[in-house]
Amino acid sequence: RRQLLEPAVQPNAAHVALARLEQKFTGDCLLVTQNVDDLHERGGSSDVLHLHGEIFKARSSKNEALLYELGDQDIYAGDLCEQGDQLRPHIVWFGEDVPMYPIAHDITQTADLVIVVGTSLKVQPASFLASAAPYHVARIVVDPKAEADVPAFYLRHPAGEIMPSLVDYLLQQGMEDLSGLDQLAPQQKN
């Protein structure tokens, strides 16, 4: 968590590109992330659903609805919520249920387009979201190591390199015409 507060840790080009897409389709675009950091928000996104929680927040150990902004503060034994229960990081620990998954699943079932970025589709249950959209809905998977486990158009490039081009394409061509995706090339690094 402390490392995320370092000035060198900044959103990459993929975070910024996704924010551009959200800004164009305000109210119709939801970013679902497995990441517990705030890089999407710092990149400009505002409609973000954190499947595994948020590392800069704390919550009651008994009442998940009691959330508190942590910022750069640490949590110690004896730090209590207003109801007297121990505070804990607002993240999903190994073996715990993912409480935001049903919400993400329901939203995915009404999607017009699903873009999966930065995952090889091996982490469950989040990888199931790529399959949750109706069969006719186009899916784009962006990850150099993604395996063809779901019917999708695969862009096997690092997200920070290809997402700006993908978002430019979607903003220019629209969400319906994906025929030119195979022509996309990663942005050149300077």
Give residue spans per PLM region:
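Conserved catalytic alpha/beta core of Sir2/sirtuin-type deacylases, generalized to analogous enzyme cores
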Residues: 1-190
